[in-house]
Swiss-Prot record:
Molecular function via GO: 2-C-methyl-D-erythritol 4-phosphate cytidylyltransferase activity
Residues that span the membrane, as ranges: none
Pathway(s) served: Isoprenoid biosynthesis; isopentenyl diphosphate biosynthesis via DXP pathway; isopentenyl diphosphate from 1-deoxy-D-xylulose 5-phosphate: step 2/6
Domain of life, per lineage: Bacteria
InterPro entries referenced in this protein's UniProt entry, alphabetically: IspD, IspD/TarI, IspD/TarI_cytidylyltransf_bact, ISPD_synthase_CS, Nucleotide-diphossugar_trans
Sites annotated Positions MEP for the nucleophilic attack: R150, K206
A GO BP entry: isopentenyl diphosphate biosynthetic process, methylerythritol 4-phosphate pathway
Protein known as: 2-C-methyl-D-erythritol 4-phosphate cytidylyltransferase
UniProt KW Mitochondrion keyword: no
Annotated site, Transition state stabilizer, chain positions: R17, K24
The entry's keywords: Isoprene biosynthesis, Nucleotidyltransferase, Transferase
EC number(s) reported in the record: 2.7.7.60
Length: 228
């Protein structure tokens, strides 16, 4: 069955941990903004019909991103939190479609990982993730309480892939209960779903701190040279 697949890129955050003079999605790597690198991944995929980008209503930078003029891209205004920004984007997407939600600050996603995720046809949805390889500590402030069993722990990545109608319902339910929604999978979990974990690549990093920029630029250079 052919599915209508829409990508959602929440890009209304300010990125305070980057300590930069502008939101991190507008910082440049290889003469392109991080947002442009991210958008190019989805614009190039033949199975993705449309991309909805959620930006802050007061954002003075997004009009300068020429790629956002693509007829395949629709702009909406974000909300108070990432989850509300995603929800706002879902309002312009048909309920019978599937939605891929991806962080604007993850420009190193590989096409091979995206293709793996798009093969999933399970209404509970799926996310890219990587198994925890470091020793994981439970903390109380800055003191260790205990060591967790890392064999059952995964790092959640994006994209995260769900039926639009179910994700919308899950977010509404979470908002009504004042639950903290840190990613789309958590909203689905709160509503009794068990999204699948699809093992992804660890170089699909989220640019969060200044030191992440050099690593992301290295990965992007590798992608260009190897055409992954």
């Amino acid at each position: 069955m052919t599915r209508k697949i829409i990508a959602v890129i929440p890009a209304s955050g300010v990125g305070s941990r980057m300590q930069a003079g502008l939101p991190k999605q507008y910082l440049k790597l290889q003469n392109k903004t991080i947002l442009e690198h991210t958008l190019e991944i989805f614009l190039a995929h033949p199975d993705i019909e449309k991309i909805v980008v959620a930006v802050a209503e007061t954002d003075p930078f997004y009009p300068q991103v020429a790629l956002l003029d693509s007829p395949k891209i629709q702009i909406v205004f974000g909300g108070e939190t990432r989850a509300h920004s995603v929800f706002n984007a879902l309002q312009v997407i048909e309920d019978d479609s599937w939605v891929l939600v991806h962080d604007a600050a993850r420009p190193c996603l590989k096409r091979s990982d995206l293709d793996k995720l798009l093969q999933i046809d399970d209404k509970q949805g799926a996310i890219l993730a990587t198994p925890a390889i470091d020793t994981m500590k439970r903390a109380d402030g800055n003191k260790i309480m205990r060591t967790e069993d890392r064999s059952t722990l995964w790092h959640a990545l994006t994209p995260q892939f769900f039926p639009t109608r179910l994700l919308k319902q899950a977010l509404i339910s979470a908002f009504k209960k004042n639950l903290t929604v840190t990613d789309e999978a958590s909203a689905m979990e709160f509503n009794g779903y068990q999204p699948r974990l699809i093992a992804g690549r660890s170089d699909n990093l989220k640019i969060t701190r200044p030191e992440d920029l050099a690593l992301a630029e290295f990965y992007l250079t590798q992608n260009t040279e190897k055409k992954i």
